[in-house]
């Protein structure tokens, strides 16, 4: 009887193993057929999340324009450099000799907080008036935008005629460039200042001067500091909504605060990112990959599917399944909502001739896999050659067969 049971167990295990092999073989054949039919240049890497076994690979070490998959590297670098509890301060300086009076200018020093929507600016104005009991400003509202270089309001390699986010130490969340302007350098901080002054005026506060850009006067003590939400929440928003303004401001914030002149330049942000990626992933900037922004709008960016898998796997090893909280999901809001009929967590990327998707899913066979799909050099048309349809079909093969 014992022998009979052993035989049954052996045969059952053999049949299960054989069926898994057949399913895996079917997935490989199906994925390869999709790749053969796709009219552009594609790269695919699929691994078992826990064992790191390669389940399928194609051009996994070739360089691609990653589009918004760049944000995965921004996520990793921000967590490693700044930490989940980091907050952006916006500081207010002025001198006062009488209750309710600001003698001279009110200075507002930004740090690149990407979360300041109109509602947040209203909240800041409310708190400032109540906390400091301000009724009158005899001078100007001076906007200190010096944390970032004014000439770096756009990223390197961005298409100048696209709708790009404006980057600055003082930014209004959700505002993008609608058309070509020669006043880019001052647009964003002045936009912030106009909304802020309007909210102050609504509360009966009188402003004698104007709104202008300048540096905070030395010797003044800070009177009030507004702190943003924690970086943990900001990163989740950046990833799920694929928000370019948020990603680029975070990228510029990677620069250590103790740098010589306190300015977060693009070159310094690249150097900070380079150091983190070298330390965590052992990848060399300029040799293995190139990234010059944090959002993925740059056509200069280059990385491979293997790089993205390495980054996601590192995040999983360090944060376990908590990393799923950062990714968009087919069952929740975000760029993947309802894209597929089963649960997938991931990051999408789209430019005019680049599409990509990377993430994690649990297959029907209860196997956790990490995947990266990248496509370049195609003519984007909404038919059977649409790269998003190509990606969906491959992910369906993964879910059904691996």
Where are these regions (language model features)?
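Beta-lactamase-like hydrolase cores
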Residues: 21-63, 85, 125-135
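A small/polar active-site loop signature that marks catalytic segments
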Residues: 176-322
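Bacterial N-terminal signal peptides
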Residues: 11-20
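Solvent-exposed loop/turn segments at secondary-structure junctions
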Residues: 50-51, 62-65, 98-99, 112-116, ...
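Small-residue-rich helix-loop
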Residues: 55-57, 255-402
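Active-site-adjacent, His/Asp/Glu-enriched structural segments that form or flank metal-binding
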Residues: 88-150, 157-162, 172-173
């Amino acid at each position: 009887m014992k022998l009979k049971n052993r035989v049954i167990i052996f045969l059952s295990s053999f049949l299960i193993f054989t069926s898994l092999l057949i399913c895996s073989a079917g997935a490989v054949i199906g994925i390869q057929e999709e790749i053969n039919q796709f009219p552009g240049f594609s790269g695919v890497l699929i691994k078992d999340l826990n064992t790191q076994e390669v389940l399928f690979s194609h051009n996994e070490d070739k360089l691609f324009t990653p589009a918004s998959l760049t944000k995965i590297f921004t996520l990793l670098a921000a967590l490693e450099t700044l930490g989940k509890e980091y907050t952006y301060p916006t500081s207010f300086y002025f001198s006062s000799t009488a209750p309710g009076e600001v003698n001279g200018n009110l200075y507002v020093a930004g740090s690149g907080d990407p979360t300041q929507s109109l509602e947040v600016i209203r909240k800041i104005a409310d708190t400032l008036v109540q906390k400091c009991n301000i009724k009158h400003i005899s001078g100007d509202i001076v906007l200190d935008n010096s944390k970032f270089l004014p000439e770096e309001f756009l990223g390197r390699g961005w298409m100048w005629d696209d709708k790009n986010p404006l980057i600055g130490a003082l930014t209004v969340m959700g505002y993008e460039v609608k058309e070509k302007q020669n006043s880019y350098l001052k647009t964003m901080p002045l936009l912030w200042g106009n909304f802020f002054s309007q909210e102050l005026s609504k509360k009966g506060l009188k402003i004698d001067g104007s709104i202008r850009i300048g540096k905070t006067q030395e010797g003044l003590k800070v009177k009030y500091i507004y702190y943003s939400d924690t970086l943990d929440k900001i990163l989740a928003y950046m990833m799920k909504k694929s928000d370019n303004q948020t990603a680029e401001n975070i990228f510029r914030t990677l620069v250590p605060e103790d740098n010589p002149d306190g300015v977060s330049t693009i070159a310094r942000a690249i150097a900070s990112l380079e150091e983190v990626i070298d330390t965590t992933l052992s990848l060399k900037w300029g040799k293995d990959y190139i990234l010059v922004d944090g959002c993925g709008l740059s056509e200069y960016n280059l990385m491979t599917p293997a790089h993205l898998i390495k980054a996601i796997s590192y995040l999983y090893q360090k944060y376990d399944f908590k990393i799923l909280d950062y990714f968009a999901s087919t069952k929740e809001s975000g760029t993947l909502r309802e894209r597929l009929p089963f649960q997938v967590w991931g990051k999408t990327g789209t430019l005019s001739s680049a599409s990509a998707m990377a993430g994690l899913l649990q297959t029907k066979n209860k196997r956790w896999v990490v995947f990266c799909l990248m496509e370049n050099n195609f003519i984007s048309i909404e038919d059977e050659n649409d790269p998003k349809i190509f990606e969906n079909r491959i992910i369906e093969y993964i879910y059904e067969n691996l």
